Curated annotation (Swiss-Prot):
This is Nucleoside diphosphate kinase. Its EC number is 2.7.4.6. One of its GO terms (cellular component) is cytoplasm. It comes from the Archaea. Major role in the synthesis of nucleoside triphosphates other than ATP. The ATP gamma phosphate is transferred to the NDP beta phosphate via a ping-pong mechanism, using a phosphorylated active-site intermediate. One of its GO terms (molecular function) is ATP binding. The active site is at 115 (pros-phosphohistidine intermediate). Keywords: ATP-binding, Cytoplasm, Kinase, Magnesium, Metal-binding, Nucleotide metabolism, Nucleotide-binding, Phosphoprotein, Transferase. The lineage of its organism: Archaea, Methanobacteriati, Methanobacteriota, Methanomada group, Methanococci. It is found in: Cytoplasm. It comes from Methanococcus maripaludis (strain DSM 14266 / JCM 13030 / NBRC 101832 / S2 / LL). The gene is ndk. PANTHER family: NUCLEOSIDE DIPHOSPHATE KINASE (PTHR11349). Its cofactor is Mg(2+). InterPro entries: NDK-like_dom (IPR034907), NDK-like_dom_sf (IPR036850), Nucleoside_diP_kinase (IPR001564), Nucleoside_diP_kinase_AS (IPR023005).
Length: 133
């Protein structure tokens, strides 16, 4: 079974959508094996999004991700990384298909509800960052 990292962003928590988003993963047969709610420090956010440093959206993303609580999760299941990414939909909610998490709940970028690892390497790095492995 494959594991992936998922973070529900501050807009998800603020809009009280956490349960509805988690339900989608459980309905699809995925198992939530670890979960914690936290507020990212500036340092943690910068490490988490370090690959984007220098990009035009970086500062806005860091500010947004440190603006409130997030829910960090490890999700396990068959082809978890690719399937979860498909469930999310396009990064920009306005381009996300209805029926995807971002298509149904996202408002704008970076308030697009959710992040999920895009590769096995990213999943391992992000799980280690948030859950200390």
């Amino acid at each position: 079974m494959e594991r992936t990292f998922v973070a529900l962003k501050p807009d998800t928590v603020e809009r009280k959508l956490v349960g509805r988003v988690i339900q989608r993963f459980e309905d699809r047969g995925f198992e939530i094996v670890e979960m914690r709610m936290l507020t990212l420090t500036m340092e943690m956010a910068e490490e988490y999004y370090g690959e984007h440093k220098g990009k035009e959206f970086y500062e806005r993303l860091i500010k947004f991700m440190t603006s409130g609580r997030i829910v960090a999760m490890v999700i396990k299941g068959e082809r978890a990384i690719s399937t979860v990414r498909k469930m999310l939909g396009n990064t920009c909610p306005c381009d996300a298909e209805p029926g995807t998490i971002r298509g149904d709940f996202g408002l704008y970028t970076p308030a697009n509800i959710i992040h999920a690892s895009d590769s096995l390497e990213s999943a391992e790095r992000e799980i280690d960052l948030f859950f200390g492995r």
